[in-house]
């Protein structure tokens, strides 16, 4: 089996097309989690927002978007293209987010995730603990409601 190196690089608003394509591939539309292109551009224009892209063989494989304010940061989005899953890309992105938070003097890192999202295993594996629940937070295409859980990790 061939080994493919994961390259992480800082992104910017010019990468919104890549982010949009990765969200389309990674987020199941029935849960209503993907952001629009304009939402991404708006958030990327905000102070304290950092986008990290993961590339495998020069192909976009995933991304993480984080917003920092004072000594707290929130993981806004993390996505890995299904064609690249189970290769450590999500772990590499999350570890990069944690390392950047440590270097920036962040005390706490927060995130919110659909309760039945398989990524919960990644977050708990990386030291996040559930601290809250938002009932019916996500609305699917058919109007179904899905709970969200909030997680926190000291940095």
List where the protein language model places each region.
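Acetyl-CoA-dependent GNAT
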Residues: 2-6, 10-85, 94-100, 104, ...
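Short glycine/proline-centered loop/turn elements that form peptide/ligand docking sites
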Residues: 90, 94, 116-119, 136-142
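Short amphipathic helical patch at the helix-1/turn junction of helix-turn-helix
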Residues: 80, 113-114
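Conserved active-site tyrosine of GNAT-family acetyltransferases
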Residues: 123-124, 128, 151
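Conserved catalytic-core motifs of GNAT/GCN5-like acyltransferases
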Residues: 110-112, 129-149
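Accessory recognition modules or surfaces
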Residues: 87, 91, 142-153
């Amino acid at each position: 089996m061939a080994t493919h190196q994961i390259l992480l690089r800082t992104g910017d608003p010019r990468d919104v097309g890549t982010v949009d394509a990765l969200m389309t591939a990674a987020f199941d539309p029935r849960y209503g989690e993907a952001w629009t292109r304009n939402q991404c551009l708006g958030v990327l224009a905000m102070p304290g927002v950092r986008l990290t892209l993961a590339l495998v063989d020069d192909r976009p494989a995933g991304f993480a978007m984080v917003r920092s304010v004072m000594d707290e940061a929130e993981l806004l989005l993390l996505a890995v293209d299904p064609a690249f899953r189970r290769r450590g890309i999500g772990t590499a992105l999350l570890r990069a987010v944690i390392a950047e938070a440590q270097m920036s003097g962040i005390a706490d890192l927060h995130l919110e995730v659909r309760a039945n999202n398989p990524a919960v295993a990644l977050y708990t594996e990386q030291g996040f603990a559930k601290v809250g629940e938002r009932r019916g937070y996500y609305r699917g295409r058919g109007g179904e409601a899905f709970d969200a859980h909030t997680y926190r990790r000291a940095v």
